[in-house]
Structure formats: C-alpha cells, structure tokens
C-alpha cells in the first residue's frame, strides 16, 4: 500500500544539490540497466547550459525532478525527468512536466523536445500521454537507434 505524499514543488536551477543528487541516482540506474554504452551521452548530459528545474518534495525530501534547457528562441528540451522508485506510478512526472510546460508557454516557446531510450516504454507512454509524438532525431542523436526524439507543439 502506498503512503500519503505531502508534495510540494520548488522551482530552482541545475546547481541545486537536491536536483544533482536525484540526477546521480537516475544515472546510476541507467548505468545498471544499460552499462558503459551510456557513457557516450555523458558530455550531452553535463549542465554546461542553464536549466530550469522543478523539484517535487515529500515532507521536505526530494522525490522527483524534471528540467528544461533552451535550445533556441523557439524551442526547449526537457531533460532529467526522474521519480524515485518508491514514488512512481502516482502521476508525479506528469505533473512536473505539465508545470514546466506552463512556464515554457508563458515564455512564448513554440515547441519542446524530449529524448529518451528507444526501449524505455514507460517514459514513451508518459510523453505520448502528455501530447508528444515521435520526431526526427536532432544533434548528436541523428542516426542513434538507441534513443528516440519526441516533440510537442505549443499552440
């Protein structure tokens, strides 16, 4: 039985240690499942550009995160969407992305991109539920069969 979550959200940035700890946990999980092949994305996953980060806290403890970075004047990329295992299947990631999308639309961006593992079915289903659809690969992901790129237009 799942306990009650007393959730609050906090808007922050990529330097927040609570966010960085969740990202380290996310990365450990990826490395356990995928192995060293994942290292080809290390440079891409560095925080060398500012990110807008939304944290979910339960009784003050970080339980989930989602972020985005600006790609250009029209678009953003959602990244580092993660929910701790004990809190999954409760709609938390959905809520975090929706909240970030509100910020993106307020700032007049036209669309967003999300990249995920080609076999990450739960993530793909979540993004489809949020209105994302498959799109052409971009940047370093062109020709990379291990990932898929998804896009959502904001009208």
Residue ranges and their predicted role:
Residues 91, 108, 131:
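Short glycine-rich hinge loops at helix-strand junctions in the catalytic core
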Residues 113-116, 124, 128-149:
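Conserved catalytic-core motifs of GNAT/GCN5-like acyltransferases
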Residues 7-79, 84-85, 97-99, 103, ...:
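Acetyl-CoA-dependent GNAT
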Residues 1-6:
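Short, Lys/Arg-enriched N-terminal segments with co-localized hydrophobic residues
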Residues 17, 90, 121, 144:
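Loop/helix-junction capping segments adjacent to catalytic residues or to phosphate/diphosphate-binding pockets
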Residues 97, 104-116:
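Conserved GNAT acetyl-CoA-binding A-motif
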Residues 84-90, 118-119:
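Active-site acidic-Proline motif in GNAT/NAT acetyltransferases
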């Amino acid at each position: 039985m799942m306990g009650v979550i007393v959730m609050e959200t906090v808007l922050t940035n990529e330097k927040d240690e609570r966010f960085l700890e969740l990202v380290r946990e996310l990365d450990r999980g990826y490395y356990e499942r995928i192995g060293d092949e994942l290292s080809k994305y290390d440079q891409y996953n560095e925080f060398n550009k500012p990110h807008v980060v939304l944290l979910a806290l339960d009784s003050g403890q970080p339980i989930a995160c989602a972020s985005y970075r600006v790609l250009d004047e029209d678009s953003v990329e959602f990244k580092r969407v993660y929910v701790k295992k004990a809190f999954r299947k409760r709609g938390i990631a959905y809520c975090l992305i929706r909240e970030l999308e509100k910020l993106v639309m307020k700032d007049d961006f036209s669309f967003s991109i999300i990249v995920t593992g080609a076999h990450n079915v739960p993530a793909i289903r979540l993004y489809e539920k949020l209105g994302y659809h498959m799109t052409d690969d971009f940047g370093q992901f062109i020709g990379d069969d291990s990932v898929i790129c998804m896009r959502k237009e904001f009208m």
